[in-house]
Amino acid sequence: MSEHTHRTMERHCDVAVVGGSAAGLAAALQLGRQRRSVIVIDAGEPRNAPAAHMHSYLGYEGHPPSDLTSIGREEVRSYGGEVISGRAVDVSRTDDGRFRVQLTGGHSVFARRVLAATGLVDELPDIEGLAEHWGGDVIHCPFCHGYEVRDQRIVGIITHPMGLHPAGLFRQLTSRLTLVLHDGVAADDAEVVALRAAGATIVDEPVRRIVTGVDGHVEAVELMSGDRIDADAIAIGPRFRVRIEPFASLGLLAAAHPTGLGDFVETDATGATSIAGLYAAGNVTDPSQQVLAAAADGSRTGAMISFSLADEDIETAARPSGNEADWDCRYGGDQMWSGNPNGTLVNEVAALRPGRALDVGAGEGGDAMWL
């Protein structure tokens, strides 16, 4: 094995963002535009990965989730930010009060502030065939994917008392709605009566499995009795668990969510957690956020982090460019320059004739570029 294989990377920045989906990238964009050095660490596991399209995001309606992240990455890079594909395994405090974000492979990122934008994991009930259709014919949010199953045979599998909460919304989308009270779940009698009066069919019996048709799509819901309910789509309200394992060394704890369905990270109005210098945004703080709301939350939290850093710099009379030691650390590591072209530069030179040299004074080495 070569010596290069054993090399580890160290990066120094103002802000390390753990999580590279809507909230994390939006925060990084804000920070980059404030001339803050920011590094996004992305494990590539967004909550909406199983979905083919995202909805109710103005300007991105119906686009694959990957469109948002790929464009977002380039926008962050165009303002000098870095995006690293990797997994944060531990975040700890250093002796000088900064943070060390340790990645798989022994790599590290050192930062003055850290943003947790790690999202959450949806935990589906243990029903045969359910997970295979998650993000397709099995949905949970009427706002995210309800319109796409309008007028279809929707079967809502109710696994907890809160499961009836979106039933009225699905009733607005279809007249063919069946609600199955799975495994003896307690349901509000008045709510059940109202839904029945509105035309929904209510079945009180456990579900055995989801039946898949020859076309690979959901065909029916099979009950423990053997009865089948024909279905085109399944609505389910999963439990959820926030991804905060990397922050255990800092003592970050999750609080029980008011719905009783999972946990979340509590923050103040600026996005700050109970750990000084550690912020959180997106689904890790609010599981109900759609992509647009998560991005907005990340953007606002990024702005609040910028305020925090600016106040600290003024208080310590730091120069805007940072002190000499910071720059030595930043450029002393292996391959500091990311190799990613500046987005503005690309736009300016795209129409120029090939074969010419351009001296752009990039400031990170590699100043002369052959077109």
Task: List where the protein language model places each region.
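Conserved class I S-adenosyl-L-methionine
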Residues: A317-R353, G355-G363
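A Rossmann-like FAD-binding core segment of flavoenzymes
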Residues: S70-L103, S108-A111, T174-G262, A310-P320
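Conserved SAM-binding loop of SAM-dependent methyltransferases across substrates and taxa
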Residues: G366-L371
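Predominantly flavin-linked oxidoreductase catalytic cores and closely associated redox partners
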Residues: H107-G216
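Beta1-alpha1 glycine-rich phosphate/pyrophosphate-binding loop at the start
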Residues: R7, C13-D67, L164-V185
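A conserved FAD-binding loop/helix module that cradles the flavin
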Residues: N283-A317
